[in-house]
A protein has these predicted regions:
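Conserved beta-propeller blade signature
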Residues: 28-30, 70-71, 125-128, 192-193
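Residue-level detector of Asp-centered blade-edge/turn motifs that repeat once per structural unit
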Residues: 23-26, 64-67, 121-123, 187-189
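Asp-box/WD-like beta-propeller blade repeats and closely related beta-sheet repeat scaffolds
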Residues: 15-19, 32-82, 97-106
């Protein structure tokens, strides 16, 4: 159904730079337009632009919690990344940080990524994987985080070793000792699988 809402352009119901998308429980599609710093809601099943939420900031990834509240990942300010994970209220236009950086002395944007995605849906559940840590959070519809799972491993990278991977993509690719990224989370009634 996505092909019926492909609307690149600069018109009022179009988007300039599609960055990410999500679908709510009613089937409405939300598109992040990075160029305009907005989230556009296209109502199911007509696929007409229903609402535009002015975020006012750039970000890498988002997901909808309800029809006007969102999570934003890697939110940028004028000097780089401002917030690792944030709650955006589409009515008040407030952006509130939810997670502090695990390694404040490391600029995560300078460390190569295997996956740009850290927000995962599994059935009715929404999860957030905190990069370079063993932490997987369950996210409520109100944007509240509860640490749900901990990946048990001694192979997590230290802050000093992580610093050595900044702006060193070749080193990042060669390094095989540490868990550096999770590229997928899957859950069944019996198992929780990380890749």
């Amino acid at each position: 159904f996505l092909s019926s809402i492909v609307k690149p352009g600069e018109g009022p119901d179009e988007y300039i730079e599609l960055m990410d998308m999500d679908v709510d429980r009613e089937g409405n599609v939300y598109i992040a337009d990075n160029a305009r710093m907005v989230i556009q809601k296209y109502r199911f099943p007509e696929w007409k632009l229903d609402e535009t939420f002015d975020v006012g900031k750039h970000y890498w990834e988002f997901c909808c919690l309800d029809d006007n509240c969102f999570l934003l990942k890697d939110v940028f300010g004028k000097d780089g990344m401002d917030m690792k994970l944030a709650y955006f209220d589409g009515k008040s236009h407030e952006v509130t940080p939810l997670v502090d950086e695990a390694f404040p002395s490391v600029n995560e944007l300078d460390v190569m990524k295997c996956s740009k995605f850290n927000l995962y849906r599994s059935g009715e559940q929404l999860y957030y994987y905190e990069r370079f840590t063993p932490n997987i959070y369950l996210i409520s519809d109100k944007g509240e985080l509860t640490q749900r799972y901990t990946i048990v491993s001694s192979n997590y990278i230290s802050e000093s070793d992580l610093k050595g991977l900044q702006r060193e993509p070749r080193k990042y690719m060669i390094e095989k000792t540490y868990i550096k990224d999770v590229i997928g989370l899957f859950e069944s009634e019996e198992y929780f699988v990380c890749m």
